[in-house]
Amino acid sequence: MQEISDLSFFQDKGNVLILTGCSKNKLNTEQEVPAEELYTGTLFRFVKEYADSINADLYIISAKYGLISRNTLIKTYDKVLRTYADAESLRPEIERELSLLHGGYDQILVIAGDKYRRTLKGIADERYYFLKTSGIGHTLHLLKEQIS
C-alpha cells in the first residue's frame, strides 16, 4: 500500500477500483435507492464524478451495510464510524468482501478518512493507493482538478 498526494497517476491506468466512505448527508427517503443516489455529501459526489471520469468502479465502505457497490439498493440510516473500535469491528466483514472483489483490479484507490481506511489495514497490498491530503478541502480541490 502506498500513500499518494496526486490523482493524475490514475488517468488511463487500466482496471481501477475506487473505495470511499459513506456520507453523513443522505437523501431523506423511506424507499430503497441506489447507494450513489442516497449519499449526498459533497465529497461523495466528487468522488463519484471522478470515478466516472476515469471509468473506474466505485464501492463504498458503509458503516451500516459494509462494502457496497454504488448500485446497491439501501435505505437511509444514521450510523457512522465514530471510533477506531467501530472500524475494527467492521474490518473483518470489509476484508472478506474485498477479498472476493479486488482480484480483478490493477489498482485500488482509497479516498476515505482514517477510520474508513482502518477497515482495510489487513487486506491492502501493493495495488492499494491511499490519497493523503491536508484535509477535505484539499481532497475536493484535487478531485475538481481531475474532473475538469
Over which residues does each language-model region extend?
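Peripheral peptide segments
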Residues: 1-148
